[in-house]
């Protein structure tokens, strides 16, 4: 590796909107603010909402189901 061409890699704090503080390293060089983290994201907390896409299938069968029956 060449000397003096690489960016400075320092420790920063990423502060979430829920109040959680994560210490990490970055070349940005300043603390950042994030919207979601693993403490408040629905995927990690288990409070994930499941979207119902079955309505589209039912609507299709309702419109075109007549053509399938003889």
Swiss-Prot record:
Q: How is the cofactor bound?
A: Binds 1 zinc ion per subunit.
MF-aspect GO terms = metal ion binding; rRNA binding; structural constituent of ribosome
**GO BP annotation list:** translation
The coenzyme or cofactor needed here is: Zn(2+)
Task: List ligand-binding residues for Zn(2+).
Answer: 16, 18, 37, 40
* Listed PROSITE patterns: RIBOSOMAL_L31
Give the record's keywords alphabetically.
Metal-binding, Ribonucleoprotein, Ribosomal protein, RNA-binding, rRNA-binding, Zinc
Origin: domain of life = Bacteria
Signal peptide span: none
Give a Pfam family name.
Ribosomal_L31
Q: In the UniProt record, does the keyword Zinc occur?
A: yes
An example GO CC term for this entry is:
ribonucleoprotein complex
Q: Does the keyword Ribonucleoprotein apply?
A: yes
NCBIfam families named among the record's database cross-references: L31, PRK00019.1, PRK00528.1
Function of the protein: Binds the 23S rRNA.
What assembly does the database describe for this protein? Answer: Part of the 50S ribosomal subunit.
Q: Which family does it belong to?
A: Belongs to the bacterial ribosomal protein bL31 family. Type A subfamily.
Q: List the protein's name.
A: Large ribosomal subunit protein bL31
């Amino acid at each position: 590796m060449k000397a003096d061409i690489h960016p400075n890699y320092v420790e920063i704090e990423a502060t979430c909107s829920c109040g959680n503080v994560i210490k990490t390293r970055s070349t940005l060089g300043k603390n950042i603010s994030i919207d979601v983290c693993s403490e408040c994201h629905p995927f990690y907390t288990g409070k994930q909402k499941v979207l119902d896409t079955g309505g589209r299938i039912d609507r299709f069968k309702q419109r075109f189901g007549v053509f399938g029956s003889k």
